[in-house]
Every structure is written in C-alpha cells, then in structure tokens.
Amino acid sequence: MDNKREFRRSPLKVQLRIDHPVHGQMLVTTRDISESGVFVVIDDARSLLNIGEVFTGQVQGLPVEAPVVRLEVVRFEPSGVGLIFQQDA
C-alpha cells in the first residue's frame, strides 16, 4: 500500500473520551498519533461512525485536564478509525 501520510505516526496508547452527538460519550483507546491526527481502536467503527463526521474528544487520565479537540473521521480499518484534528473556525 502506498503511504501518502505527511506526518510520521508515533505509538501512543491513552484513553480518549469521545463526545458524539448521536452516541453520547464513548471511552476508546488510541493506537498512534501524529501532528495531524490520531487512530483509535473502536469495535465495529463503521456501524457507529461515518466518513466526514465531526465530534469532540479529550484525552483522559493526565495530571492536568487536556484540551477538548475537534476530530473528523477520515478512514476505517478493521481495528478502528483514523481521525484528523480540525482547526476551530
């Protein structure tokens, strides 16, 4: 497969709280992160999320409160979903 990613991914396993407008709060685990986005492990992600869908997320379990970020669904894999960070308008 041709890798067209602009930013290098780094392994990172942390808890991420997703606040979804339809499904409510979901606690998921990240697999890796880059400057532009994050991959999260979600069982049956295709049945819960759609490409282009935007929602917020916040890393959990840090010594200080993490910022809430806007995330957009950009790709699916059998193990989860790729999300990109959205800039606030």
Which residue ranges define each predicted feature?
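Structured alpha-helical
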Residues: 1-89
